[in-house]
């Protein structure tokens, strides 16, 4: 685990005076471009992975490996929303370098501490790369969709029927603290990946998995309906009491994982059930807003957000933009929230000697003295999502997506060795193969990655 101390390099980056200030007009594209350029530069000040002796793709201490995956996802969004390719080469190198020996984002250097949620943040980045038509790697390199499928496959193979009648544990390996905990970010991650793969590939088996995970989360209470229109996502539950007691902390990123996952499924299926679920989670997200401006309700009020939690609004901002792209009825509300939050975030980016270091609190019309990768990432995401309705929604394999897939990715089974299956023409991701790979493993409870 990384020590929670700031490196000298990070401090010097914070103090490096450029003399530029961040001014934002949410209605002016050039203003948005200039603001996000400053913020992206500030985010990349924390990255030294391409320097001699450093690790490609990893950010400086004290930021864990998973947050690097989150940060590269923000840089990918920056490329897409702002149409700025400044960091594309670094992004490609990092996503490929950290894929690991099995090309499933379980690199040996991280596996002693890696959890299911950690793996997911890299998987989400490559899923977005496929959906956004980010330039494909050379043909002899792993491809974005195949990498995303590998993340899904390896996570699904860890589905644990031996405790609580299903669900993913937080941790992959039994020696890590939290192995006994089944939490919403890990299960929500599997749901979210299944939802996005459903839409991208058209493969109904991914939808079956999304339904399985959602139903399990609802069954144990991680997803709860506390009022008819109020859907909440609690943090987790413990297998030691058979998942009967809930940790009722609520976090923006957990809520957003489920909300956006529902939006992806609705957009693909047009099923009114998923439509209503999307809108209910959106309505319930008001718990994370004050005067239409985002805040991290689980920790910000007590001024005790840790380094990880300071990045959560970044992912929620991303999920808001995706939901708006996919569900038209959500747009009026989401655009209002994004505009107000972007203005608050811009006001917070007024600190440090450079004059545009971002803080955590977007409610005070100024800098709160906080700074870090998470704060910078969150401000970048909310401001660039001002353009969420100005850019195309995520592509699919049926409407322009070009990333090649591999439904056997991440498994020990080669696709060519599986029995022939009826795969619909046009489903380039290989609908049906996933059934043989994951369905049989699920029935056998083959938890092959859990030691």
Swiss-Prot record:
A lipid is attached at residue 427 (GPI-anchor amidated aspartate). Residues 428-451 form a propeptide. Residues 397-419 are annotated as: Disordered. One of its GO terms (cellular component) is extracellular region. Residues 1-21 form the signal peptide. Required for normal synthesis of the cell wall. This is Mannan endo-1,6-alpha-mannosidase DCW1. It comes from Eremothecium gossypii (strain ATCC 10895 / CBS 109.51 / FGSC 9923 / NRRL Y-1056).
